[in-house]
């Protein structure tokens, strides 16, 4: 696939499927090393379309359960001087329970876990074709910030996973 960056399609407003802000409450977090690249299917004509995200044998995704719109995701362009521009992915999450399992997961994240986040947006497009987005697929997301305070946000643990600077 060429890296020429030639615009090939119109950017139109789909009045039958207007965008809606937000993501669904359940997020899948996957250890990047648990993804089976040989069984994962990327559309040969569209490198942004993954039709099958496969995990290695006996590996599973971790569910981060949210409520309302406390979790969010974003992407921002990172201009590169000597290579093609990249996208920095950011997932902002909230751990609603501070039990041992949650603390263990956050500790594992802080020890350098490389993660992939699969989110389902509220804006799904025609026939749900645009419902899912995969963040950190190529380079993984790492824990960037984590904050807990008994005096803020109902005592929940706020954290951010993002592409590592320079490794988008």
Predicted regions and their residues:
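Solvent-exposed edge beta-strands and adjacent loop segments
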Residues: 2-90, 139-151
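Generic structural motif
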Residues: 18, 30-35, 96-100, 122-124, ...
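Structured, beta-strand-rich domain cores
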Residues: 67-135
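Mixed-charge, glycine-accented linear interaction segment located at domain edges/termini
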Residues: 134-168
């Amino acid at each position: 696939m060429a890296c020429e960056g030639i615009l090939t399609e119109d950017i139109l407003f789909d009045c039958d499927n207007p965008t809606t802000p937000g993501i669904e409450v359940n997020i899948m977090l996957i250890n990047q090393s648990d993804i089976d690249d040989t069984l994962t299917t990327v559309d040969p004509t569209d490198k942004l379309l993954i039709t099958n995200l496969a995990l290695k044998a006996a590996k599973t995704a971790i569910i981060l359960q949210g409520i309302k719109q406390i979790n969010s995701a974003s992407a921002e362009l990172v201009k590169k001087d000597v290579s093609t521009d990249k996208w920095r992915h950011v997932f902002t999450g909230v751990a609603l329970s501070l039990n041992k399992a949650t603390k263990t997961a956050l500790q594992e994240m802080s020890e350098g876990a490389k993660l992939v986040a699969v989110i389902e947006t509220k804006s799904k497009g025609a026939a749900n074709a645009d419902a899912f987005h995969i963040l950190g697929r190529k380079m993984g997301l790492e824990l960037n910030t984590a904050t807990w305070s008994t005096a803020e946000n109902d005592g929940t643990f706020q954290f951010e996973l993002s592409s590592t600077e320079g490794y988008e």
